[in-house]
Amino acid sequence: MKNLHALMPACLLLTASAMAAPSNIGSAGDIHFTITIKAATCELENDSIDVNMETVVLQRPVKVGKELNQKNFSIGLKDCAYATKASVTMDGSPDPTDPSLFALDSGGATGVALKIKTSGGEQQYPSSTDSTPVEHTVWFDGTNKLNYIASYVPVKPDATVGTANATVNFSVTYE
């Protein structure tokens, strides 16, 4: 019995030290993190662009669909670090007669709409027509000009003269 009492504390000491020791339950694992850090994308040269369409003479008979007074304008981008593509969306009221064109502000000429296309001929549609943004290649050294052409387009044979202003908002996303 004395041997059993002496053996019991010795076993408890061995058990306690075994429980305190860390145990290896398998090999160590690795966690890999992947991240790309980019500088800010392009900045707009101007938040607002004014295009002077000058005076248009509406000839009779009106030629529906004929582009009048084409005027060049551009959206300027600068400091385009790491951006290779800019996608432009334009939002304005679609013309009720031809929703692929932008409506003029009310209170002026009627039966006339505004057409916007790139210098390469790709038309920019009002975003409310579920159009696809127009893509442009951008270069990260220097200033980029996204070149466009605006023109008035008669959409009705009984178009009337008057003020022909339009407001079109644009947004640019980058990749």
UniProtKB/Swiss-Prot annotation:
Question: Can you tell which superkingdom this protein's organism belongs to?
Answer: Bacteria
Say if the entry is tagged with keyword Signal.
yes
- What InterPro entries does the entry give? Adhesion_dom_fimbrial, Adhesion_dom_fimbrial_sf, Adhesion_dom_sf, Bact_Fimbrial_Adh_Pro
Question: Which residue pairs form cystines in this protein?
Answer: none
Q: Which GO terms describe its cellular component?
A: pilus
Cellular location of this protein?
Fimbrium
Query: Where in the sequence is the signal peptide annotated?
Result: 1-20
A single GO BP term for this record reads: cell adhesion involved in single-species biofilm formation
Q: What is its main location?
A: other
Pfam families associated with the record: Fimbrial
Q: What keywords appear on the UniProt entry?
A: Fimbrium, Signal
Q: Which family does it belong to?
A: Belongs to the fimbrial protein family.
- PANTHER family from the entry? FIMBRIAL SUBUNIT ELFA-RELATED, FIMBRIN-LIKE PROTEIN FIMI-RELATED
Name of the molecule in the record: Protein LpfE
Native species of this protein? Salmonella typhimurium (strain LT2 / SGSC1412 / ATCC 700720)
The primary gene name is: lpfE
